[in-house]
């Protein structure tokens, strides 16, 4: 009985103390105030058009969400030195005084989301909030992030900026957020990611950039993101990623790149090579160009599929034109550097042109090979061409009726090492080099070269003999 009586006395004492506290600490009329688990002033969905006065100074949590508050004046919560949580989301905020949160040095959570008319926040609004670890600014109609907006928020871990109208991501915006682990930027209109956009985010674990207009990512934009585990870039305007972009992401486990107009040509090789080594979970990377690869997953292509440079001939067009070329519109380099395999098809000075070489048969003006031009030419007409070994038919093919001119061989011309200075004669050297595959001096070119030589070089007697055998030149 004594134990039951003792328990009842304690309960009665607790109720009396709570009533006394409520009397001693007045609560705004539209609010409910309670002390457990933390001292709380709760005024949600009461139709309030302004921040209520008379909020208990001992409040640790203040809930003002779901009202019609349009403005937060300076020092609205200055007396609440112990405040750790402040919810102002889902109101009609169109402005916040730069000194509205002055004195809230212990504030940990600030929710300003779902205030579509806010649009602009003064860069000094969050100064002094050194303990803030969660900040909601999503769905606030923000068009820009002012310089220094997040300065001094060293404890911030969660930053929600999704579903705004952000049109740029300035350098060094998040530089002071060394402890930030989650950054939500999806659902904006960000067109590119500059070099220092994420500078200083050494602790970032999750970065959501999907559903923007991102067409370019600077090669070093992710340089400080060595701890990043989740990266969403789907539903953007990306057609390629530079080779260096993903290299710093040593901890990456989840990657989504789908719903982008990827160009799967030689410029996609760096991304393709990185994806072959990636051991985490990744989405498909469907190709947009060229047409022959449209819809196929870049990850599943062979290296040989990524040759040449595609042209933007498909239905895709980027968001902004500004009279740029297709490559500039797509954010692509203008051409690809040939790799080792590609270089084999590039004609080099001093090398014979292959049958499939694009330069074959092209002669610059004034570079016509020397010769009398009387017979058909079998030599490559390019400046770097050489006489094919089969260009000259054997002399036996030129004999009429089995006649054999005196002094000439009955077999095809034999390759000679060259003429010595002692016996070198013009006719001797030319006859010895015909059909050898070397252009030499360039005089013996074409199937009619030997008759021409006989006419122009031989002594008169030899010329007459050749005339009767071979016919006129």
From Swiss-Prot:
<feature type="lipid moiety-binding region" description="GPI-anchor amidated serine">
    <location>
        <position position="447"/>
    </location>
</feature>
<dbReference type="GO" id="GO:1905576">
    <property type="term" value="F:ganglioside GT1b binding"/>
</dbReference>
<keyword id="KW-1003">Cell membrane</keyword>
<dbReference type="GO" id="GO:0009986">
    <property type="term" value="C:cell surface"/>
</dbReference>
<dbReference type="GO" id="GO:0008201">
    <property type="term" value="F:heparin binding"/>
</dbReference>
<feature type="region of interest" description="Disordered">
    <location>
        <begin position="346"/>
        <end position="446"/>
    </location>
</feature>
<feature type="glycosylation site" description="N-linked (GlcNAc...) asparagine">
    <location>
        <position position="82"/>
    </location>
</feature>
<dbReference type="GO" id="GO:0150052">
    <property type="term" value="P:regulation of postsynapse assembly"/>
</dbReference>
<feature type="repeat" description="LRR 1">
    <location>
        <begin position="56"/>
        <end position="79"/>
    </location>
</feature>
<feature type="disulfide bond">
    <location>
        <begin position="309"/>
        <end position="336"/>
    </location>
</feature>
<keyword id="KW-0677">Repeat</keyword>
<feature type="disulfide bond">
    <location>
        <begin position="27"/>
        <end position="33"/>
    </location>
</feature>
<feature type="domain" description="LRRCT">
    <location>
        <begin position="260"/>
        <end position="310"/>
    </location>
</feature>
<keyword id="KW-0325">Glycoprotein</keyword>
<dbReference type="GO" id="GO:0045121">
    <property type="term" value="C:membrane raft"/>
</dbReference>
<dbReference type="GO" id="GO:0050919">
    <property type="term" value="P:negative chemotaxis"/>
</dbReference>
<dbReference type="GO" id="GO:0044295">
    <property type="term" value="C:axonal growth cone"/>
</dbReference>
<dbReference type="GO" id="GO:0038131">
    <property type="term" value="F:neuregulin receptor activity"/>
</dbReference>
<keyword id="KW-0472">Membrane</keyword>
<feature type="repeat" description="LRR 5">
    <location>
        <begin position="153"/>
        <end position="176"/>
    </location>
</feature>
<feature type="disulfide bond">
    <location>
        <begin position="31"/>
        <end position="43"/>
    </location>
</feature>
<feature type="repeat" description="LRR 9">
    <location>
        <begin position="250"/>
        <end position="273"/>
    </location>
</feature>
<dbReference type="Pfam" id="PF13855">
    <property type="entry name" value="LRR_8"/>
</dbReference>
<dbReference type="InterPro" id="IPR001611">
    <property type="entry name" value="Leu-rich_rpt"/>
</dbReference>
<dbReference type="GO" id="GO:0043198">
    <property type="term" value="C:dendritic shaft"/>
</dbReference>
<keyword id="KW-0449">Lipoprotein</keyword>
<dbReference type="InterPro" id="IPR000483">
    <property type="entry name" value="Cys-rich_flank_reg_C"/>
</dbReference>
<dbReference type="GO" id="GO:0007166">
    <property type="term" value="P:cell surface receptor signaling pathway"/>
</dbReference>
<protein>
    <recommendedName>
        <fullName>Reticulon-4 receptor</fullName>
    </recommendedName>
</protein>
<dbReference type="GO" id="GO:0010977">
    <property type="term" value="P:negative regulation of neuron projection development"/>
</dbReference>
<dbReference type="GO" id="GO:0038023">
    <property type="term" value="F:signaling receptor activity"/>
</dbReference>
<keyword id="KW-1015">Disulfide bond</keyword>
<dbReference type="GO" id="GO:0098978">
    <property type="term" value="C:glutamatergic synapse"/>
</dbReference>
<keyword id="KW-0675">Receptor</keyword>
<feature type="compositionally biased region" description="Basic residues">
    <location>
        <begin position="413"/>
        <end position="429"/>
    </location>
</feature>
<feature type="glycosylation site" description="N-linked (GlcNAc...) asparagine">
    <location>
        <position position="372"/>
    </location>
</feature>
<feature type="repeat" description="LRR 7">
    <location>
        <begin position="202"/>
        <end position="224"/>
    </location>
</feature>
<comment type="subunit">
    <text>Homodimer. Interacts with MAG. Interacts with RTN4 and OMG. Interacts with LINGO1 and NGFR. Interacts with KIAA0319L. Interacts with OLFM1; this inhibits interaction with LINGO1 and NGFR.</text>
</comment>
<feature type="repeat" description="LRR 8">
    <location>
        <begin position="225"/>
        <end position="248"/>
    </location>
</feature>
<comment type="similarity">
    <text>Belongs to the Nogo receptor family.</text>
</comment>
<dbReference type="GO" id="GO:0043025">
    <property type="term" value="C:neuronal cell body"/>
</dbReference>
<dbReference type="GO" id="GO:0051963">
    <property type="term" value="P:regulation of synapse assembly"/>
</dbReference>
